């Protein structure tokens, strides 16, 4: 968890995809390419578990991040769905047949995240406010 960033919960977005995480073998090159092609605004990178994490915004209610792939991970993207309560939605997802990839945990002040694999193999992150 980082102390540098925080996030205030935005009510009314339950069920909306509000963040997309891009896993890249070369995050800096991906960032440069995205900045050249899309009208995204980037914040200065901060240190994450896989190295520099590059946050971007593309609207007042959406954005994402670019990070280095983990060992053995293929490049790709993970949509993050905004939820009212990450713990409650995580449990509901498991009861509905999802597989747990990461239990709910705080990633920064104000943000709690869990990750599941939905039936059919799709990976989806759930993001809600901290308690």
Predicted features by range, described:
Residues 17-25, 70-94, 112-117:
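Vicinal oxygen chelate
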Residues 1-31, 77-79, 127-131:
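N-terminal beta-strand motif that seeds the catalytic metal site of vicinal oxygen chelate
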Residues 30-34, 93, 121:
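Conserved active-site tyrosine of GNAT-family acetyltransferases
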Residues 48-52, 73-75, 107-112:
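Short acidic/glycine-enriched loop/turn segments that link adjacent beta-strands
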Residues 41-48, 102-107, 131:
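Conserved catalytic-core motifs of GNAT/GCN5-like acyltransferases
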Residues 11-17, 21-62:
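Core segments of cupin and vicinal oxygen chelate
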Residues 56-60, 116-119, 129:
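Active-site beta-strand termini and strand-to-loop segments that position acidic
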């Amino acid at each position: 968890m980082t102390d540098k960033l925080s996030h205030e919960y935005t009510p009314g977005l339950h069920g909306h995809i509000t963040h997309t995480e891009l896993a890249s073998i070369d995050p800096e090159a991906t960032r440069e390419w995205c900045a050249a092609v899309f009208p995204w605004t980037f914040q200065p990178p901060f240190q994450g578990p896989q190295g520099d994490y590059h946050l971007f915004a593309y609207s007042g209610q959406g954005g994402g991040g670019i990070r280095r792939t983990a060992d053995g991970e293929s490049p790709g993207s993970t949509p993050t769905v905004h939820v009212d309560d990450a713990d409650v939605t995580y449990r509901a997802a498991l009861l509905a047949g999802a597989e747990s990839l990461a239990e709910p945990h705080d990633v920064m002040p104000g943000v709690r995240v869990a990750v599941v694999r939905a039936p059919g193999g799709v990976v989806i992150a759930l993001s809600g406010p901290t308690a």
